[in-house]
């Protein structure tokens, strides 16, 4: 890994992939075709892009039961424990409707309502992610969403990854479709003969999925446009190089565009970590992916002081931040921008990916400066409630009418005055 002495001025805000003109046109064509031809278009795209001809798009209950039965019993118990932790954490995020009554009899409040239906896209490719099923489905269930739909591209044999199906079965999700890519997003947004539309779409995917989510946004809601995974480790001379290297590689192995950065005031630690990364790379199964990520988006930044290192971390605003210093929680108040913060050497990033309970769907590309990770809030909507009393309207009606006329809206003013029997 390259080592660089710095004094601020760094950024994770890489160029956001907007796709080529050809890719954008392809996505628009796919969406239009799915809207026009429904299931027939989905099956054609599945045969073309995934190499499998399907008679039915929907995963059967029997397929889910087989996948669940084939799962190792110990692994199933781990999934159950992780699910319990995730559910316990997210229950604390749930908001209830509330009311307040003022002295004049006015009642004001907020009604919190779960979304009716949500869709979760689970990507295929080089790895299967049952953890993504847990992290997206559980907060939806805690919020009270009644209909949860999963779509995922099928394997060449027409099946979905057993881990994904087993996790969904454990959570009681039964509406799952063998559809991937932009065509899946189109189906979730607009519906087909088999797939009823949803209100909001969640989950990461490739550039075609990202472009499709952008295109359907407004007709339905979306969670975010997820970028490649990121980790920043803030460490001092007390940290262990082998642990830091392992954590950097844990993100680098995700994707060739993943980012892994160490920020430290210790050149000795920087050199040791760089050496340890090379040593650990030798035996990593996904070595080629991790190495490409480190070459393109990996770095070790050396600052003059720990205080400067904290400033650099806040500028980076990473998806994942690990703090491995002599007194990690002493920095809690100064650290402002990160999707998730992991304090201390035993809080390795994969703890949050799989088991601790907080959500692993987090803002990337420096957007942790202004956005948050996935939560129960993403699965509800809030409506203002106003029950104005006659006393209150008589007391404030003239003010409301005056405000309306200030903006040139006479009908607004008259709507108030007719109730005060002052209409002209």
Curated annotation (Swiss-Prot):
Q: Which GO terms describe its biological process?
A: L-histidine biosynthetic process
A GO CC term attached to the entry = cytosol
Q: Which domain of life is it from?
A: Bacteria
Gene3D superfamilies given in the database record: 1.20.5.1300, Nitrogenase molybdenum iron protein domain (3.40.50.1980)
EC number(s)?
Answer: 1.1.1.23
Detail which positions bind NAD(+).
Answer: 121, 183, 206
Pathway(s) served = Amino-acid biosynthesis; L-histidine biosynthesis; L-histidine from 5-phospho-alpha-D-ribose 1-diphosphate: step 9/9
Co-factor note (free text): Binds 1 zinc ion per subunit.
Is the NADP keyword given for this protein? no
GO MF annotation, one: NAD binding
Give the required cofactors: Zn(2+)
Swiss-Prot/TrEMBL keywords:
Amino-acid biosynthesis, Histidine biosynthesis, Metal-binding, NAD, Oxidoreductase, Zinc
List ligand-binding residues for substrate.
229, 251, 254, 320, 353, 407, 412
Catalysed reaction equations from the record: L-histidinol + 2 NAD(+) + H2O = L-histidine + 2 NADH + 3 H(+)
Where, in this chain's numbering, is Zn(2+) bound? 251, 254, 353, 412
The record places the active site at: 319 (proton acceptor), 320 (proton acceptor)
Which family is this protein grouped under?
Answer: Belongs to the histidinol dehydrogenase family.
Q: What does this protein do?
A: Catalyzes the sequential NAD-dependent oxidations of L-histidinol to L-histidinaldehyde and then to L-histidine.
Q: Which PANTHER family match?
A: HISTIDINE BIOSYNTHESIS TRIFUNCTIONAL PROTEIN, HISTIDINOL DEHYDROGENASE HDH
Return the protein name: Histidinol dehydrogenase
Record the organism.
Geobacillus kaustophilus (strain HTA426)
């Amino acid at each position: 890994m390259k080592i660089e002495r710095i004094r601020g001025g760094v950024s994770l805000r890489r160029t956001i992939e907007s796709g080529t003109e050809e890719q954008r046109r392809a996505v628009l064509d796919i969406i239009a075709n799915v809207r026009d031809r429904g299931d027939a278009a989905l099956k054609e795209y599945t045969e073309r892009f995934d190499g499998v001809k399907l008679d039915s798009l929907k995963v059967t209950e029997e397929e889910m039961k087989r996948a669940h039965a084939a799962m190792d019993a110990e692994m199933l118990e781990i999934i159950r424990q992780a699910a319990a932790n995730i559910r316990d954490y997210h229950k604390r995020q749930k908001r209830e409707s509330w009311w307040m009554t003022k002295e004049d009899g006015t009642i004001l409040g907020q009604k919190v309502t779960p979304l009716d239906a949500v869709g979760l896209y689970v990507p295929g490719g080089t790895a299967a992610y049952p953890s993504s099923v847990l992290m997206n489905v559980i907060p939806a269930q805690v919020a009270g969403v009644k209909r949860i739909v999963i779509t995922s591209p099928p394997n060449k044999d027409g099946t979905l990854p057993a881990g994904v199906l087993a996790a969904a079965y454990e959570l009681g999700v039964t509406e799952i479709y063998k559809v991937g890519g932009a065509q899946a997003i189109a189906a979730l947004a607009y519906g087909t003969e088999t797939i009823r539309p949803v209100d909001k779409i969640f989950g990461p995917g490739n550039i075609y999925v990202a472009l499709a989510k952008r295109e359907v946004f407004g007709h339905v809601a979306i969670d975010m446009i997820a970028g490649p995974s990121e980790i920043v480790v803030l460490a001092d001379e007390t940290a262990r190089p082998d642990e830091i290297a392992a954590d950097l590689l844990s993100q680098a192995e995700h994707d060739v565009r993943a980012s892994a950065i160490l920020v430290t005031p210790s050149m000795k630690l920087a050199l040791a970590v760089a050496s340890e990364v090379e040593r650990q790379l030798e035996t990593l199964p996904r070595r080629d992916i991790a190495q490409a990520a480190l070459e393109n988006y990996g770095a070790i930044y050396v600052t003059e002081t720990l205080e400067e290192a904290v400033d650099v971390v806040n500028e980076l605003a990473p998806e994942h931040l690990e703090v491995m210093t002599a007194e990690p929680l002493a920095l809690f108040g100064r650290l402002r921008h990160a999707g998730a913060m992991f304090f201390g050497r035993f809080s390795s990033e994969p703890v949050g990916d799989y088991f601790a309970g907080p959500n692993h769907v987090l803002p990337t590309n420096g957007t942790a400066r202004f956005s948050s990770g996935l939560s129960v809030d993403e699965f509800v909507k809030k409506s203002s409630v106003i029950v104005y009393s006659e006393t209150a309207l008589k007391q404030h009606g003239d003010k409301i009418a005056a405000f309306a006329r200030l903006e040139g809206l006479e009908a607004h003013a008259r709507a108030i005055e007719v109730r005060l029997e002052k209409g002209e």
